[in-house]
């Protein structure tokens, strides 16, 4: 009888732990929202750092990803140069993680950051002579446009490398980092649609820069990458029987 009672208590405790953890994260994020409304960036940074460390301890990737990106945003608001250290942190994370899905998401984030930086600094990049066949400097402020474009393309390739995994992984599993949109419902909220869409957006942000580099009549590799992503998505959704996803992708293409 005692053994049965102990077993029941253990099972109940195991069921309670995840709920308590979720409540704790929710409480912390509510504090973040309050700090944000009060325009307290240092408090937001402190709280998101706490969430990140808690997520790391509990191996909760969605919480870690959301906390890291929020902390990164507010650190950059206070000190723009923090972007470089935080980007290196993401690149170190992607090397160390043993979770394929986390790795894909991190590559997608990194690609987006490089694309945003290049797009925001187009004028300066256009003044520089392209450097090819040379390892980029440690400081990306010294890079040329082609180096950023290559970083974006390489990280996107890694992000979408395992399309089978992305198709069978629901973005629901990455809440609260992922916010479910209405359109993603037509794709059954799979991670393939999410990361492919992010990849296309990142490539589009550097497409104009790439046009400048390839104005000698050669085909723009960035444009080719965009076409290739759509070209892979259409048959993938057709094969899985997602009619709505297939039609929407074909229309966007």
What role is predicted for each listed range?
Residues 1-28:
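Bacterial Sec-dependent N-terminal signal peptides
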Residues 25-31, 35-253:
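Extracytoplasmic/secretory-pathway proteins
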């Amino acid at each position: 009888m005692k053994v049965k009672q102990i077993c029941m208590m253990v099972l109940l405790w195991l069921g309670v732990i995840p709920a308590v953890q979720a409540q704790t994260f929710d409480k912390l994020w509510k504090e973040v929202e309050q700090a944000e409304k009060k325009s307290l960036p240092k408090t937001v940074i402190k709280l998101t750092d706490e969430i990140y460390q808690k997520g790391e301890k509990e191996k909760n990737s969605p919480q870690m990803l959301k906390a890291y990106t929020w902390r990164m945003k507010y650190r950059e608001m206070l000190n723009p140069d923090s972007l470089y250290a935080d980007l290196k942190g993401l690149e170190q994370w992607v090397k160390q993680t043993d979770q394929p899905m986390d790795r894909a998401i991190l590559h997608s984030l990194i690609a987006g950051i490089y694309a945003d930086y290049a797009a925001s600094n187009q004028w300066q990049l256009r003044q520089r002579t392209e450097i090819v066949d040379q390892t980029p400097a440690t400081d990306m402020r010294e890079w040329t446009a082609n180096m950023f474009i290559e970083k974006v393309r390489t990280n996107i390739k890694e992000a979408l490398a395992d399309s089978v995994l992305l198709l069978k992984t629901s973005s629901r599993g990455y809440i609260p980092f992922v916010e479910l949109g209405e359109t993603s419902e037509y794709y059954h909220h799979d991670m393939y649609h999410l990361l492919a869409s992010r990849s296309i957006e990142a490539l589009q942000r550097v497409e104009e820069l790439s046009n400048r580099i390839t104005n000698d009549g050669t085909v723009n590799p960035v444009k080719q990458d965009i076409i290739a992503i759509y070209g892979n998505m259409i048959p993938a959704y057709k094969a899985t029987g997602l009619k709505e996803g297939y039609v929407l992708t074909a229309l966007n293409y």
